[in-house]
Amino acid sequence: MNILMLSSTFPYPPTRGGTQVRTFNLLKYLSQRHSITLVTQREGDVTDAEVAGLRDCVDHLAIFERPPDSATTGILKKIQRFGKFLQQGTPPSVLNRYSVEMQTWVDNWVEAEKCDVITCEHSVNEIYVRSHFPKQLKTIVNVHSSVYATCRNQLSTGISENSLRDRINLPLLRRYEQNYCAKFSAIVATTEEDKIQLEEFNPNSKITVIPNGVDLVSFPNRTTDPGGHRLIFIGAMDNLANIDAVCFFSNEVLPEIQKLYPDATFDIVGSHPVSEVLALAQKPGINVIGRVPSMVEYLHQSTICVVPMRTGFGIKNKTLEAMAAGVPIVASDRGLEGLAVDGASDPLRALRANKPTEYITAISQLFEQPHLRSELSHNGRQLVETEFTWDIAGKSYEQVCLARSNTNS
Protein backbone atom coordinates (compact mmCIF):
# COMPACT_ATOMS: atom_id res chain seq x y z
CA MET A 1 0.00 0.00 0.00
CA ASN A 2 1.21 3.52 -0.80
CA ILE A 3 0.68 5.81 2.19
CA LEU A 4 1.12 9.59 2.17
CA MET A 5 1.76 10.89 5.69
CA LEU A 6 1.46 14.62 6.47
CA SER A 7 3.28 16.05 9.49
CA SER A 8 4.04 19.76 9.65
CA THR A 9 6.05 18.89 12.79
CA PHE A 10 9.43 17.39 11.85
CA PRO A 11 9.18 13.98 13.58
CA TYR A 12 12.85 13.14 14.07
CA PRO A 13 14.50 12.39 16.38
CA PRO A 14 11.52 10.99 18.30
CA THR A 15 12.85 12.44 21.55
CA ARG A 16 11.81 16.03 20.71
CA GLY A 17 8.27 15.84 22.09
CA GLY A 18 4.99 13.92 22.21
CA THR A 19 3.90 14.73 18.64
CA GLN A 20 7.25 13.57 17.28
CA VAL A 21 7.23 10.36 19.35
CA ARG A 22 3.80 9.24 18.12
CA THR A 23 4.33 10.27 14.50
CA PHE A 24 7.77 8.68 14.14
CA ASN A 25 6.93 5.37 15.78
CA LEU A 26 3.75 4.82 13.75
CA LEU A 27 5.65 5.80 10.60
CA LYS A 28 8.45 3.38 11.52
CA TYR A 29 6.02 0.50 11.95
CA LEU A 30 4.11 1.16 8.71
CA SER A 31 7.34 1.56 6.72
CA GLN A 32 8.22 -2.10 7.40
CA ARG A 33 5.25 -3.25 5.30
CA HIS A 34 4.20 -0.35 3.10
CA SER A 35 5.63 2.37 0.89
CA ILE A 36 5.70 5.59 2.92
CA THR A 37 5.93 9.12 1.56
CA LEU A 38 6.32 11.74 4.29
CA VAL A 39 5.67 15.44 3.78
CA THR A 40 6.98 17.61 6.59
CA GLN A 41 8.39 21.03 7.49
CA ARG A 42 11.89 21.82 8.62
CA GLU A 43 12.40 24.14 11.57
CA GLY A 44 15.55 26.13 12.25
CA ASP A 45 17.06 23.71 14.75
CA VAL A 46 16.75 20.62 12.54
CA THR A 47 20.22 19.43 11.47
CA ASP A 48 21.27 17.85 8.17
CA ALA A 49 22.10 14.66 10.09
CA GLU A 50 18.52 14.55 11.42
CA VAL A 51 17.15 15.01 7.89
CA ALA A 52 19.36 12.13 6.71
CA GLY A 53 18.20 9.97 9.63
CA LEU A 54 14.54 10.56 8.78
CA ARG A 55 15.13 10.01 5.05
CA ASP A 56 16.45 6.52 5.84
CA CYS A 57 13.09 5.63 7.42
CA VAL A 58 10.82 6.38 4.45
CA ASP A 59 10.63 5.71 0.71
CA HIS A 60 10.20 9.35 -0.19
CA LEU A 61 10.68 12.50 1.91
CA ALA A 62 9.42 15.93 0.88
CA ILE A 63 10.59 18.78 3.12
CA PHE A 64 9.34 22.37 3.13
CA GLU A 65 10.55 25.31 5.16
CA ARG A 66 8.31 26.20 8.08
CA PRO A 67 6.55 29.56 7.54
CA PRO A 68 7.71 32.36 9.89
CA ASP A 69 5.98 32.35 13.26
CA SER A 70 2.98 34.67 13.64
CA ALA A 71 4.53 36.18 16.77
CA THR A 72 7.00 37.97 14.50
CA THR A 73 4.53 39.15 11.87
CA GLY A 74 2.80 41.96 13.73
CA ILE A 75 -0.67 42.79 14.99
CA LEU A 76 -2.21 43.38 11.55
CA LYS A 77 -1.46 39.83 10.40
CA LYS A 78 -2.88 38.46 13.67
CA ILE A 79 -6.11 40.41 13.15
CA GLN A 80 -6.33 39.12 9.57
CA ARG A 81 -5.86 35.54 10.77
CA PHE A 82 -8.56 35.93 13.44
CA GLY A 83 -10.88 37.36 10.78
CA LYS A 84 -10.29 34.23 8.70
CA PHE A 85 -11.05 32.12 11.78
CA LEU A 86 -14.43 33.86 12.15
CA GLN A 87 -15.27 33.61 8.44
CA GLN A 88 -13.75 30.29 7.37
CA GLY A 89 -13.39 28.46 10.68
CA THR A 90 -9.65 27.67 10.59
CA PRO A 91 -7.80 28.67 13.79
CA PRO A 92 -4.78 31.00 13.60
CA SER A 93 -2.59 28.24 15.09
CA VAL A 94 -3.32 26.11 12.01
CA LEU A 95 -3.00 28.94 9.47
CA ASN A 96 0.28 29.91 11.14
CA ARG A 97 1.98 26.75 9.82
CA TYR A 98 0.22 26.61 6.46
CA SER A 99 2.52 26.36 3.44
CA VAL A 100 1.13 27.06 -0.05
CA GLU A 101 4.07 25.18 -1.57
CA MET A 102 3.33 22.13 0.58
CA GLN A 103 -0.36 22.30 -0.40
CA THR A 104 0.53 22.36 -4.11
CA TRP A 105 2.83 19.36 -3.65
CA VAL A 106 0.09 17.38 -1.84
CA ASP A 107 -2.51 18.31 -4.48
CA ASN A 108 -0.23 17.13 -7.29
CA TRP A 109 0.66 13.88 -5.51
CA VAL A 110 -3.01 13.01 -4.92
CA GLU A 111 -4.01 14.09 -8.44
CA ALA A 112 -1.31 11.79 -9.88
CA GLU A 113 -2.85 8.91 -7.87
CA LYS A 114 0.46 8.11 -6.19
CA CYS A 115 -1.13 7.10 -2.87
CA ASP A 116 -3.93 4.86 -1.63
CA VAL A 117 -4.20 6.49 1.79
CA ILE A 118 -3.42 9.94 3.18
CA THR A 119 -2.87 10.35 6.93
CA CYS A 120 -2.71 13.57 8.92
CA GLU A 121 -0.35 13.07 11.86
CA HIS A 122 -1.91 15.55 14.30
CA SER A 123 -5.10 17.40 13.42
CA VAL A 124 -3.24 20.60 12.46
CA ASN A 125 -2.41 18.89 9.13
CA GLU A 126 -6.09 18.58 8.17
CA ILE A 127 -5.75 21.89 6.35
CA TYR A 128 -3.94 20.12 3.48
CA VAL A 129 -6.80 17.65 2.89
CA ARG A 130 -9.27 18.96 0.31
CA SER A 131 -12.96 18.20 0.84
CA HIS A 132 -13.04 16.12 -2.39
CA PHE A 133 -10.07 13.89 -1.43
CA PRO A 134 -12.26 11.20 0.23
CA LYS A 135 -13.85 10.51 -3.17
CA GLN A 136 -10.41 9.58 -4.54
CA LEU A 137 -8.66 7.83 -1.63
CA LYS A 138 -8.91 6.93 2.03
CA THR A 139 -8.33 9.90 4.36
CA ILE A 140 -7.31 9.45 8.01
CA VAL A 141 -6.80 12.06 10.72
CA ASN A 142 -4.75 11.01 13.74
CA VAL A 143 -6.06 13.35 16.45
CA HIS A 144 -3.41 13.56 19.16
CA SER A 145 -5.81 15.55 21.35
CA SER A 146 -9.09 17.41 20.84
CA VAL A 147 -8.40 21.14 20.38
CA TYR A 148 -11.88 22.03 21.63
CA ALA A 149 -11.57 19.87 24.77
CA THR A 150 -8.08 21.21 25.47
CA CYS A 151 -9.20 24.85 25.23
CA ARG A 152 -12.26 24.18 27.39
CA ASN A 153 -10.09 22.47 30.00
CA GLN A 154 -7.55 25.32 30.07
CA LEU A 155 -10.38 27.78 30.71
CA SER A 156 -11.95 25.64 33.45
CA THR A 157 -8.62 25.13 35.26
CA GLY A 158 -7.63 28.79 34.96
CA ILE A 159 -4.35 28.20 33.14
CA SER A 160 -5.29 29.77 29.80
CA GLU A 161 -2.64 32.23 28.59
CA ASN A 162 -5.42 34.55 27.40
CA SER A 163 -8.83 33.70 28.85
CA LEU A 164 -10.72 36.41 26.93
CA ARG A 165 -9.32 35.16 23.63
CA ASP A 166 -10.02 31.52 24.50
CA ARG A 167 -13.60 32.24 25.60
CA ILE A 168 -14.19 33.79 22.17
CA ASN A 169 -12.37 30.92 20.46
CA LEU A 170 -14.16 28.07 22.24
CA PRO A 171 -17.37 27.93 20.12
CA LEU A 172 -15.26 28.54 17.01
CA LEU A 173 -13.01 25.60 17.89
CA ARG A 174 -16.09 23.42 18.36
CA ARG A 175 -17.29 24.34 14.87
CA TYR A 176 -13.79 23.83 13.45
CA GLU A 177 -13.35 20.35 14.94
CA GLN A 178 -16.79 19.30 13.77
CA ASN A 179 -16.15 20.55 10.23
CA TYR A 180 -12.67 19.16 9.68
CA CYS A 181 -13.58 15.70 11.00
CA ALA A 182 -16.25 15.45 8.30
CA LYS A 183 -13.50 15.35 5.62
CA PHE A 184 -12.09 12.04 6.83
CA SER A 185 -12.93 8.41 6.09
CA ALA A 186 -11.53 7.41 9.48
CA ILE A 187 -10.57 9.20 12.70
CA VAL A 188 -8.01 7.98 15.23
CA ALA A 189 -7.97 9.20 18.86
CA THR A 190 -5.51 8.39 21.66
CA THR A 191 -8.05 7.91 24.48
CA GLU A 192 -11.69 6.94 25.03
CA GLU A 193 -12.28 10.43 26.44
CA ASP A 194 -11.22 12.05 23.18
CA LYS A 195 -13.24 9.49 21.21
CA ILE A 196 -16.40 10.41 23.13
CA GLN A 197 -15.74 14.11 22.48
CA LEU A 198 -15.20 13.54 18.74
CA GLU A 199 -18.26 11.26 18.48
CA GLU A 200 -20.37 14.06 19.90
CA PHE A 201 -19.34 16.19 16.91
CA ASN A 202 -19.50 13.40 14.32
CA PRO A 203 -21.85 10.61 15.45
CA ASN A 204 -21.55 8.75 12.12
CA SER A 205 -17.76 8.80 11.95
CA LYS A 206 -15.60 5.69 12.29
CA ILE A 207 -13.38 6.51 15.30
CA THR A 208 -10.68 4.12 16.53
CA VAL A 209 -8.77 4.53 19.80
CA ILE A 210 -5.04 3.85 19.37
CA PRO A 211 -3.08 4.77 22.51
CA ASN A 212 0.55 5.84 22.44
CA GLY A 213 3.27 3.30 23.04
CA VAL A 214 6.81 3.06 24.37
CA ASP A 215 10.00 1.82 22.75
CA LEU A 216 10.96 -0.80 25.34
CA VAL A 217 14.57 -0.86 24.10
CA SER A 218 14.97 2.88 24.74
CA PHE A 219 13.17 2.63 28.10
CA PRO A 220 14.41 -0.55 29.81
CA ASN A 221 13.13 -1.54 33.24
CA ARG A 222 15.38 -0.36 36.08
CA THR A 223 17.34 -3.06 37.88
CA THR A 224 17.53 -1.39 41.31
CA ASP A 225 15.47 1.01 43.40
CA PRO A 226 17.71 4.00 44.25
CA GLY A 227 15.62 4.94 47.29
CA GLY A 228 16.11 8.48 48.58
CA HIS A 229 13.81 11.47 48.01
CA ARG A 230 14.42 12.38 44.39
CA LEU A 231 11.44 13.49 42.29
CA ILE A 232 11.42 13.94 38.51
CA PHE A 233 9.19 15.44 35.81
CA ILE A 234 9.92 14.77 32.12
CA GLY A 235 8.58 16.56 29.04
CA ALA A 236 9.10 19.37 26.55
CA MET A 237 9.39 22.49 28.69
CA ASP A 238 8.01 24.94 26.16
CA ASN A 239 4.63 23.17 26.26
CA LEU A 240 1.93 25.15 28.10
CA ALA A 241 0.49 22.14 29.95
CA ASN A 242 3.97 21.03 31.10
CA ILE A 243 4.90 24.55 32.19
CA ASP A 244 1.75 24.77 34.29
CA ALA A 245 2.40 21.32 35.78
CA VAL A 246 5.94 22.06 37.01
CA CYS A 247 5.04 25.55 38.28
CA PHE A 248 2.05 24.18 40.19
CA PHE A 249 4.14 21.37 41.70
CA SER A 250 7.13 23.60 42.52
CA ASN A 251 5.03 26.30 44.18
CA GLU A 252 2.24 24.36 45.89
CA VAL A 253 3.53 20.84 46.56
CA LEU A 254 7.33 20.69 46.78
CA PRO A 255 7.74 23.19 49.68
CA GLU A 256 5.41 21.05 51.81
CA ILE A 257 7.28 17.88 50.84
CA GLN A 258 10.57 19.54 51.81
CA LYS A 259 9.19 20.34 55.28
CA LEU A 260 8.83 16.58 55.79
CA TYR A 261 11.91 15.56 53.77
CA PRO A 262 14.42 18.45 53.76
CA ASP A 263 16.73 16.68 51.28
CA ALA A 264 13.96 16.18 48.69
CA THR A 265 14.90 17.35 45.18
CA PHE A 266 12.90 17.92 41.99
CA ASP A 267 14.53 17.43 38.57
CA ILE A 268 12.77 19.04 35.58
CA VAL A 269 14.10 17.23 32.51
CA GLY A 270 13.11 18.18 28.97
CA SER A 271 13.96 20.37 26.00
CA HIS A 272 13.49 24.12 25.57
CA PRO A 273 12.74 25.28 29.15
CA VAL A 274 11.12 28.72 28.95
CA SER A 275 12.06 31.60 31.28
CA GLU A 276 9.20 30.77 33.65
CA VAL A 277 10.62 27.26 34.09
CA LEU A 278 14.27 28.38 34.28
CA ALA A 279 13.30 30.71 37.14
CA LEU A 280 12.23 27.70 39.23
CA ALA A 281 15.90 26.71 39.56
CA GLN A 282 16.24 29.57 42.08
CA LYS A 283 14.09 27.59 44.51
CA PRO A 284 15.82 25.14 46.88
CA GLY A 285 16.15 21.60 45.59
CA ILE A 286 14.92 22.29 42.05
CA ASN A 287 17.17 21.40 39.10
CA VAL A 288 16.12 22.56 35.62
CA ILE A 289 18.18 20.22 33.47
CA GLY A 290 16.88 20.82 29.93
CA ARG A 291 17.34 18.41 27.05
CA VAL A 292 19.40 15.28 27.78
CA PRO A 293 20.78 12.52 25.53
CA SER A 294 19.15 9.77 27.60
CA MET A 295 15.90 10.43 29.46
CA VAL A 296 15.86 6.93 30.89
CA GLU A 297 19.12 7.48 32.82
CA TYR A 298 17.50 10.32 34.76
CA LEU A 299 14.36 8.25 35.33
CA HIS A 300 16.38 5.34 36.72
CA GLN A 301 18.10 7.66 39.22
CA SER A 302 14.76 8.98 40.54
CA THR A 303 12.68 7.74 43.44
CA ILE A 304 9.34 8.88 41.99
CA CYS A 305 8.13 10.40 38.72
CA VAL A 306 5.41 13.03 39.18
CA VAL A 307 2.94 13.92 36.40
CA PRO A 308 0.96 16.82 37.93
CA MET A 309 -0.84 17.82 34.71
CA ARG A 310 -3.89 20.03 35.13
CA THR A 311 -4.67 20.27 31.43
CA GLY A 312 -3.71 18.62 28.15
CA PHE A 313 -5.87 15.87 26.66
CA GLY A 314 -4.72 12.55 25.24
CA ILE A 315 -2.54 9.80 26.63
CA LYS A 316 0.76 11.04 28.09
CA ASN A 317 4.00 9.61 26.73
CA LYS A 318 5.79 10.74 29.88
CA THR A 319 3.57 8.52 32.03
CA LEU A 320 4.11 5.48 29.81
CA GLU A 321 7.87 6.08 29.60
CA ALA A 322 8.22 6.31 33.38
CA MET A 323 6.18 3.12 33.77
CA ALA A 324 8.35 1.34 31.20
CA ALA A 325 11.47 2.46 33.10
CA GLY A 326 10.03 0.94 36.29
CA VAL A 327 9.73 4.26 38.13
CA PRO A 328 6.77 4.63 40.55
CA ILE A 329 4.34 7.35 39.49
CA VAL A 330 2.20 9.90 41.29
CA ALA A 331 -0.05 11.62 38.75
CA SER A 332 -3.25 13.59 38.22
CA ASP A 333 -6.38 12.49 36.38
CA ARG A 334 -4.99 14.21 33.27
CA GLY A 335 -1.62 12.51 33.69
CA LEU A 336 -3.32 9.10 33.94
CA GLU A 337 -5.89 9.60 31.16
CA GLY A 338 -6.47 6.43 29.16
CA LEU A 339 -4.73 4.18 31.70
CA ALA A 340 -6.34 1.61 34.04
CA VAL A 341 -4.18 2.10 37.13
CA ASP A 342 -6.33 2.02 40.26
CA GLY A 343 -9.75 0.60 39.44
CA ALA A 344 -11.41 -2.02 41.62
CA SER A 345 -10.35 -4.82 39.24
CA ASP A 346 -6.93 -3.38 38.33
CA PRO A 347 -3.55 -4.09 39.95
CA LEU A 348 -2.30 -0.85 41.55
CA ARG A 349 -0.06 0.73 38.90
CA ALA A 350 0.20 4.37 40.02
CA LEU A 351 -0.97 6.66 42.81
CA ARG A 352 -3.52 9.31 41.86
CA ALA A 353 -3.39 12.89 43.16
CA ASN A 354 -4.99 16.15 42.07
CA LYS A 355 -4.82 18.43 45.13
CA PRO A 356 -1.57 19.44 46.89
CA THR A 357 -2.57 17.47 50.00
CA GLU A 358 -3.13 14.35 47.88
CA TYR A 359 0.33 14.69 46.32
CA ILE A 360 1.94 15.09 49.74
CA THR A 361 0.19 11.97 51.06
CA ALA A 362 1.00 9.84 48.00
CA ILE A 363 4.65 10.93 47.75
CA SER A 364 5.18 10.40 51.49
CA GLN A 365 3.72 6.89 51.22
CA LEU A 366 6.16 6.01 48.45
CA PHE A 367 9.15 7.58 50.19
CA GLU A 368 8.37 5.51 53.30
CA GLN A 369 7.34 2.19 51.74
CA PRO A 370 9.89 0.38 49.50
CA HIS A 371 7.44 -2.50 48.97
CA LEU A 372 4.83 -0.06 47.56
CA ARG A 373 7.45 1.40 45.21
CA SER A 374 8.29 -2.14 44.09
CA GLU A 375 4.61 -2.98 43.51
CA LEU A 376 4.01 0.10 41.33
CA SER A 377 7.28 -0.45 39.47
CA HIS A 378 6.41 -4.05 38.59
CA ASN A 379 2.76 -3.44 37.72
CA GLY A 380 3.47 -0.31 35.66
CA ARG A 381 6.12 -2.04 33.55
CA GLN A 382 3.84 -5.05 33.02
CA LEU A 383 1.01 -2.79 31.80
CA VAL A 384 3.26 -1.16 29.21
CA GLU A 385 4.66 -4.49 28.00
CA THR A 386 1.20 -5.98 27.45
CA GLU A 387 -0.81 -2.99 26.17
CA PHE A 388 1.34 0.01 25.23
CA THR A 389 4.16 -0.90 22.85
CA TRP A 390 4.56 0.79 19.47
CA ASP A 391 4.19 -2.62 17.81
CA ILE A 392 0.69 -2.92 19.27
CA ALA A 393 -0.18 0.67 18.25
CA GLY A 394 1.37 0.19 14.80
CA LYS A 395 -0.66 -2.95 14.09
CA SER A 396 -3.86 -1.11 15.01
CA TYR A 397 -2.94 1.86 12.81
CA GLU A 398 -2.17 -0.46 9.91
CA GLN A 399 -5.63 -2.01 10.27
CA VAL A 400 -7.23 1.45 10.07
CA CYS A 401 -5.23 2.15 6.89
CA LEU A 402 -6.18 -1.19 5.32
CA ALA A 403 -9.87 -1.12 6.28
CA ARG A 404 -12.26 -0.55 3.42
CA SER A 405 -13.55 3.02 3.43
CA ASN A 406 -17.28 3.66 3.23
CA THR A 407 -16.54 7.11 1.85
CA ASN A 408 -14.71 5.91 -1.25
CA SER A 409 -16.73 5.68 -4.40
What are these regions (language model features)?
Residues 318-321, 328-335:
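Short hydrophobic beta-strand element within catalytic cores of glycosyltransferases
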Residues 138-141, 148, 166-174, 178-221:
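Donor nucleotide-sugar binding/catalytic pocket of nucleotide-sugar-dependent glycosyltransferases
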Residues 1-64, 111-113:
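N-terminal subdomain of nucleotide-sugar transferases
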Residues 8, 72-95, 139-178, 236:
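Acceptor-binding helix/loop patch of EC 2.4 sugar-transfer enzymes
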Residues 365, 372-386, 396-399:
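A short, well-ordered alpha-helix in the C-terminal region of glycosyltransferases
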Residues 185, 285, 297-314, 325-327:
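Acidic donor-binding loop of glycosyltransferase active sites
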Residues 209-284, 288-301:
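Conserved catalytic-core segment of nucleotide-activated headgroup transferases in glycan assembly
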